[in-house]
Amino acid sequence: MPGKLRVHELAKKLGITSKELLATLKEQGEFVKTASSTIEPPVVKKMQEHYQATGGAKPDTDNKPTPAKPAAKPGAPAPKPGTAQKPTAPTPGAVAAPKPGTAAAKPTPAKPAAPKPTAAKPAPAKPTAPKPATPAFSGPTPGDAAKKAAEDKATPKPGGEAPRPNAMPRPMAKPGPKPGARAPRVANNPFSTGAADRPGPRPGGGGPRPGGGPRPGGAPRPQGGQRSGAPRDGQGGPRGQRPGPGSGGPRPQGGNAAGAASQERQGGGRRPSPAMMPPTPGQMPAKAPGKGGRGGGQGGPGGGSGGFNRGGGGGAGRGGRRGGTAGAFGRPGGAPRRGRKSKRQKRNEYESMQAPNVIGGVRLPDGRGQTLRLARGASLSDFADKIGADAAALVQALFNLGEMVTATASVSDETLMLLGDEMNFKVEVVSPEDEDRELLESFDLQFGEDIGDEQDLAKRPPVVTVMGHVDHGKTRLLDTIRKANVGSGEAGGITQGIGAYQVKVEVEDDLRTITFLDTPGHEAFTAMRARGAKSTDIAVLVVAADDGVMPQTIEAINHAKAADVPIVVAVNKIDKPDASPEKIRGQLTEYGLVPEEYGGDTIFVDISAKQGTNIDELLASVCLTADAELDLVANPDMDAQGVAIEAHLDRGRGPVATVIVQRGTLRVGDSIVVGDTYGRVRRMVDEYGRDVDEAGPSRPVQVQGLNGVPGAGDNLLVVEDDRIARQIANQRNARKRNALAARSRKRVSLEDLDSVLKETSVLNLILKGDNAGSVEALEEALLKIEMDDEVELNIIDRGVGAVTQTNVTLAAASNAVIIAFNVRAEGKATEEANAEGVDIRYYTIIYRAIEEVEAALKGMLKPIYEEREVGKAEIRAIFKASAIGLIAGCMVEEGKVRRNATARIIRDGNVIASNAKIESLRREKDDVTEVSAGYECGMVLSYPDIAVGDKIEVFEMVEVPRDS
């Protein structure tokens, strides 16, 4: 069948019911919802093998020849009368022969006989009881048993005519096409009516059935009877006591379901299990006797007669109700018994009782130390999918742990680990590098390795990064090498972006190509310097001979060492009078850079970038280091891989990324993905603005055609087509968004909820810059500003390019300030900003932007007030006025007393009023604003409980400037 099978289709194919197949799937650990659910091919194969191994429908069809199928209907009662003992004498042996191993273990004659010694009255009626002992011989095969059964069916049996109407009216119509599959289940159908649902005879199941007479009390039960270990008690009467001989004569095959099931098993059929048909109260046999069933002929619901059991009595029968499952699985009838539990159910129950995992009334799964890998910024829904739990339960559990999180919100790493610890899960947050590698592997891509053999590799030019402190001459050095002037065009004379150049220089009469990267030296550009160190082969550390080792010099050394990049030191400005190259060598020795002349392995070159002194010697040292210490090779024939060292938004060209190809060849028209952006290479230009059709290893080019501005430092990868590039970029973008949301989300616990809800001063900023590196550096520098908890800096948006109307609209809605770094407002953005009252600040030097933002944050701080004493007075007399109240007659002892001032009232050294107001102040009969020391006055205080002798201290709160 094409496609996946559904449950009901597989059940039909196997010849079983969908309910039975669903139960088996659940027992095997395959959880399928409904009969219309699809099943994977491995599960289909597993079920087929399961039913073949347990003797299911398929093997039965092999063991039952075609002639036996039509004979099953009329022959069902034939083998069971008392007169059929002679022709079917060997049949019990045939029944037991297919299971010689179980003949001794299960149908042990001693166990069934032991509980029934009281049945001594019917002793003479079982002369054939010893015959089932014949299973000791090998016995005929199931095929022989089928032949014998067919012969028995062909012979008319007088005793079998009576029960025929109830024997097989319905079930054999179903198992007709697949008798081996349907026959055992029909006997177990609790919704059948009487013995009509009992299966027909099995191959080898035509053995003699005892008559209705009583059985000897100590006689062993025949082999084809019920299962071992459980005696057959009548389904209404007490165990071992039968009302008497069966009133209906010998029972047909359907009378004892246990016998039928046993014959089916011994005849090659599958073995039913209680888990396949869980008993329900409607299927259980009743404890109270029924109204009396037909002796033997009524089947399972009767008084327990039929098969190898004695005929049922009227008092013990249950013929009036629908068929039960007594004896269906080889167990006796009687009181209902709970179905057996699987080992998995028992183990799960035991483990849940041993260590219940309940958090705040929510029951959660126990991880038992299992390791979970979650992406950074994952939500509780992602967590719940991993462990198979309900996301709402995790939300409630986390709320009880003091964290308020929604099911779909990105959660911080600490919160994920906290929740994992509570459930005994070990949560591992996947690093961005591992996450990106797994993403590329899902598309059969990899980054960072050359593809091909060694003969495919070719030499490539070295990539050299010029690093050092600000104003130490890095850009001037590159200008001298390139014979150009770049530094004069930079704002403030400092480099605020990475410049990439490829120059051809003559070194020892050999024309060499070297790629140079110029990194910023200002402290705000730490990330740029680190990125430049990771993208390079050799680092040239420029140190001014007149300035010495500075903080950014040390930082550049650490970046180069972290990237495991060899360092060549260029001691610049040796032409200045106060230059001291030897001092520089001594200082750098402390940081592990020991000159060769001191016995170390670091090359030091004294240069003057301004005068052009020793520039050739520096280039020769760079080439020598590249040849001696590095094996600079790459495969130029593979798909290009590289890194974006800078990116910006050009108004006429759109997003432009400056990339260095590390391996392979980048061509116009290639589909590329750079970080979370993608596109097709529309145009490439070199550092001189000339169009380039292809760029080989170590070649810096500017790429146009991306759908957005990538981040500085993002990897460039050529993929097969735009569809793959778009999928990779979208997944990266979603992960980046989740990680950013988790990082920016402030953890709010119930304990600090009150303080969070209090009004705080927030400065919202929108950052716009000329390139991605500048925006990144500005954002990091602003976030490093240390302020009190009273104010908060919130960067709500950042981007590359001019200030647009969209930025102004967002700023107006969020009451934000726009910081424009090396860009201007375009179009009607300025008019809209003026109309909306949006403040746009323009900067060209980064530290000025940092200083002004820091000053703005300080201005947003709540003012600090301190108490300043104004004067002191003493109450000398108290006057009463009906309209005013108490009037204090005072003498001003120090300073001044002002009207509406705040006063502190002290009595016997204790403050009785700390914040009283001077509501009225008079001198003689005149209202005055203040009274100086040495004068008397009358005042009315807001605090009425005053007395003669009280001291009044008048003070005021004065705002003081903040130090920080």
UniProtKB/Swiss-Prot annotation:
Residues 124-133, 166-178 have a biased composition (Pro residues). Residues 518-521 are annotated as: G3. Residues 572-575 are annotated as: G4. SUPFAM superfamilies: Initiation factor IF2/eIF5b, domain 3 (SSF52156), P-loop containing nucleoside triphosphate hydrolases (SSF52540), Translation proteins (SSF50447). Residues 35-353 are annotated as: Disordered. Residues 337-346 have a biased composition (Basic residues). Residues 64-108, 220-233 have a biased composition (Low complexity). Its main location: cytoplasm. Residues 234-252, 290-333 have a biased composition (Gly residues). Residues 608-610 are annotated as: G5. Residues 145-155 have a biased composition (Basic and acidic residues). It is found in: Cytoplasm. GTP binds at residues 468-475, 518-522, 572-575. GO terms for cellular component: cytosol. GO terms for molecular function: GTP binding; GTPase activity; translation initiation factor activity. SMART domains: RAS. Residues 468-475 are annotated as: G1. InterPro entries: EF-G-like_DII, IF2_II, IF2_N, P-loop_NTPase, Small_GTP-bd, T_Tr_GTP-bd_dom, TF_IF2_bacterial-like, TIF_IF2. Belongs to the TRAFAC class translation factor GTPase superfamily. Classic translation factor GTPase family. IF-2 subfamily. This is Translation initiation factor IF-2. It comes from Corynebacterium efficiens (strain DSM 44549 / YS-314 / AJ 12310 / JCM 11189 / NBRC 100395). The gene is infB.
